[in-house]
Amino acid sequence: MQRLIRLLVCCLAFAGQASFAAVDGKAILEKVDKNLTPESYEMYRKLINIEPDGSRKEFVLYTAKQGRDSMVGLFLEPATDAGRTTLRLGDNMWLYIPDVGRPIRITSLQSVVGGIFNNADLMRLDFSTEYEVTAVEEQGKTYRLSLKARTDAVAYDRLIMVVDRAALLPLTIEAYAASGMLIKTLRYRDVKDFGDGIRRPAVLETDSPLYQGYKAVMLFAKIKRRSFRDEVFTLNYMSRIKELR
């Protein structure tokens, strides 16, 4: 009888370990990152800020990323912003304005485009670089991941990410401040094949209870794997990012 009990206990322990392994939050988040973008790539984006009266302001950006925490951006449109560039190295961010002629430090919660998307959204690193998974729930065809910022320098203290279980792509993300206040909700949609094994949402929409009636949309295009020289991701290269295109 005691042998049977020990056997049942062992079976239950094994089943628990198997269940935990099946919903390994860290592995899920890393796969989400891999499915959204390669480790090193270039892409184009259109950003659309929509005001309560329906008026819009649009931006077109070229972006390049190398490794886990190096990223540059180049404004192509509108003409008033064309030539401006951005650089992110880890938690540090800069904006280069041709008329100023030197890089200016900016923060993750500011926005170089105005509207709801902040600099952390525009120059987003892999989620697994900035957040750790604190809980995972299986909810039908989705996973619900609770994420906690690894450092105080991260724009959002906590994220709730709903992930499509089959595609391992994000569906929605709720971003919270340390106080528990909801800052914004991000919604991914319109999954497209960008080629070379990259299949991901082409549209990201956001709204915020802090900006009632305002919306913002990010459209992704021409995502391609590409490697760059290390000098591209330096302050001295910010005035030359246009040479990458």
What are these regions (language model features)?
Residues A22-S40, K46-I48, S55-K57, T80-D157, ...:
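Flexible, processing/modification-adjacent segments and terminal tails
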Residues Y41-E42, G67:
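Extracellular or lumenal secretory-pathway regions
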Residues V72-D81:
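N-terminal post-signal-peptidase region of extra-cytosolic proteins
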Residues G140-L235:
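Gly/Pro-enriched, hydrophobic low-complexity segments
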Residues A64-Q66, L89-G90, S108-V113, R189-K192, ...:
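A short, sequence-level motif marking secondary-structure junctions
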Residues L7-Q17:
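Bacterial N-terminal signal peptides
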